[in-house]
Amino acid sequence: GLFGDLGTSTDDRAQLFWTSGHQYEMTDYREWTNGYPSVKFRNSNYFSASTPTVFSGTDFPLFRLADAYLMYAECVVRGGSGGTLNQAVDYVNALRTRSNATTITPGQLTLDFIIDERARELNLEGHRRSDLIRFGKFTGGSYLWPWKGGAKDGTAIPDHYNLFPIPLKALQANPKLTPQFG
């Protein structure tokens, strides 16, 4: 996984996953005791009584400095001008040091590293689908994850899944919109 063994990882971000009584790999996506349930936005003792599921309506951040640092690193690795590889590594290492993860060298800062670091740092914050599309890993079969395409071990999905559908009401309200069928 992204953190190695969750039971022994020194990366503080790995502690966001509750593993007591759970098996690491999901065998049935409908069972709460399968997979990696996260407590990232669980806040059962803050201001109000817990709900029966012990999850609260805690707001989550939309903009984070960590996201900006990782965007900077991605732009540099993709060849963008105005940034330096050393500064990108410093930004990434600031995040990793804060999380008690090992630092990296400039040679380790690759696009594959960045997409994995985005998954570790920004998990459950609503970025993953867009990240996978931007990195060319959301559709097709070259990058699989459990339950991709509805198959336990993952399977390829068609490229039209890279597109968000235009809601029917929007199409009906504006005849100039053209849907991209898939």
Task: List PLM regions with ranges.
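Flexible loop/turn segments at secondary-structure boundaries
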Residues: Y24-E25, G83-T84, S130-D131, T139
